[in-house]
Design a protein with these regions (language model features):
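Extracellular/virion structural assembly segments
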Residues: 1-218
Length: 218
């Protein structure tokens, strides 16, 4: 487990921002004008580390790894990677993933993510909830996860479903790539704000501020 993942797994709290970058202006007539300038909508995380760490060999190694990677190296992180925080990103549907489950369909475009049902999902009753708003879905091995914006039900006919996502497709996966959801999704990030460490009596150490992470979109 990476040092940054250790920080996330034991964090006091994590702030998540997915807001678009929006330009706002006021016209001479007093009208408020807005324009979204960012199609990719990168995820941003502010992570508050737990207050104190025992300054033992494991903690020193963790800190050294984080400082070595610094703010210029990409890291892959997971949310809900331990049992106590899995609820934060748990998959809410009743669909099946894996070899007989959802796979990527290259008809996907824009915010419409088209998925092949696979034999397991095709056998589910009509109307089964496959995805709920807020679910996170990703093509296995791809850099970018997507948030589902509306409930998706198993159709009565057909072999595909369309999932509307929070942002347009950034990269297209290979046809037939298996999909993952929930705690199996990952983010590639860079640290935009790296706190310093403070040594305390009793062989303790603390981080002096939050970690700020930004999704690395290329």
């Amino acid at each position: 487990m990476s040092g940054l993942q250790t920080i996330i797994n034991s964090a006091q709290d994590i702030d998540i921002s997915r807001a678009s970058m929006v330009a706002t202006s006021v016209s001479r007539s007093g009208r408020l004008l807005t324009a979204a300038r960012n199609w990719v909508k990168p995820w941003k995380f502010t992570v508050s580390a737990k207050p104190y760490w025992h300054y033992d060999s494991d903690t020193r190694a963790m800190i050294e790894e984080i400082l070595t990677l610094d703010r210029h190296t990409e890291k892959t992180i997971y949310l809900g990677a331990n049992a106590g925080s899995a609820w934060t990103i748990a998959y809410q549907g009743a669909g099946v993933f894996g070899a007989t489950g959802f796979t990527f369909n290259t008809a996907s475009a824009g915010t419409n993510l088209v998925l092949n049902l696979g034999t397991a999902n095709a056998a589910l009753p009509t109307g089964t909830v496959l995805f709920r708003a807020g679910d996170i879905v990703q093509a296995a091995g791809d850099r970018y996860p997507y948030a589902v914006t509306a409930t998706v039900l198993k159709p009565a006919t057909g072999t595909t479903v369309t999932v509307v996502t929070n942002r347009g497709l950034i990269t297209s996966a290979t046809a037939g790539t298996q999909m993952v959801a929930g705690v199996n999704c990952s983010w590639v990030v860079k640290v935009s704000k790296l706190p310093t460490t403070r040594l305390l009596p009793g062989r303790l150490v603390e981080f002096t501020s939050e970690f700020e992470l930004v999704e690395s979109v290329i």
